[in-house]
Design a protein with these regions (language model features):
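Walker A/P-loop NTP-binding motif of AAA+ ATPase domains
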Residues: 43-238
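AAA+ P-loop ATPase mechanoenzymes
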Residues: 1-64, 79-80
Length: 239
């Protein structure tokens, strides 16, 4: 009896072995896994843009979400956000997405949306589903939810075309599937695009945040030069 009691007292439940995300990703060629190292304070951007990003992070803070859930305001306590970063190329959209991931202590699964199109009938639409199905499978297998980063998502987000050609129908069908997947998505998704002007209104309604990234002004350009030029480099006078 003493032995049985001792076993009960000292019983430790077996820890379920956590599957590493790297091992799951070995069997697929869709996503690039990124472990972010950039801090949001390392990025030179307009102050109002930084404030917007910091506000999103505060709203998505785990303690805040748990409190809202306990009050019955939020149905679950998971971090969920659908975000669009838009603006000219080279303005820090991807880098800011990685910085936000670091602040949320999340890995990033990055996908280059320019690879989605296929010359084969129906394959582009299947590829859209495959992105989200694979992401969902990774989340369920690894018991963690990395941020899904869709780079250059212009063809997903642009206004649907009113045409009867095969390519027009394929484009619209692909976007309809994307809309459906966005509607169901659970987690954090960030899509980057250079062209917000052509954004379909249906997509605009389904994203929680739309953040503009502008070209740096003179003050920010000066900060960039000062950050990356060697401190002890010899320059001509008044450089």
């Amino acid at each position: 009896i003493d032995e049985i009691l001792q076993r009960i007292i000292n019983f430790e439940p077996k820890q379920s072995k956590k599957i590493k995300i790297e091992s799951v990703l070995k069997d697929q060629d869709i996503f690039e896994l990124i472990e972010p190292s950039t801090d949001i304070n390392d990025i030179i951007m307009p102050e109002n843009t930084k404030e917007l990003l910091e506000n999103i992070l505060k709203q998505q803070d785990k303690k805040v979400l748990e409190r809202l859930h306990s009050w019955g305001i939020k149905s679950n306590k998971n971090i969920e956000a659908k975000i669009i970063f838009y603006g000219p190329a080279g303005t820090g959209k991807t880098m800011s997405a990685l910085a936000m991931a670091k602040s949320m202590k999340k890995s990033v699964l990055s996908f280059d949306c320019s690879k989605i199109l296929s010359k084969w009938v129906g394959e582009s639409e299947q590829n859209v589903r495959k992105i989200f199905d694979t992401y969902k499978n990774i989340v369920q297998t690894c018991k963690q939810s990395p941020i899904l980063l869709l780079n250059e998502a212009d063809q997903f987000l642009s206004t649907r075309v009113d045409g009867s050609s095969g390519s027009d129908k394929m484009h619209n069908q692909m976007q309809n599937i994307f809309l459906e997947q966005i509607e169901r998505f659970s987690g954090v998704i960030i899509a980057t695009t250079n062209f917000l002007e052509s954004l379909d209104s249906a997509f605009s309604r389904r994203f929680d945040y739309k953040i503009e990234f502008k070209k740096p002004d003179f003050k920010d350009r000066l900060k960039i030069w000062e950050k990356f030029l060697p401190k002890k480099a010899l320059f001509e006078k008044d450089f």
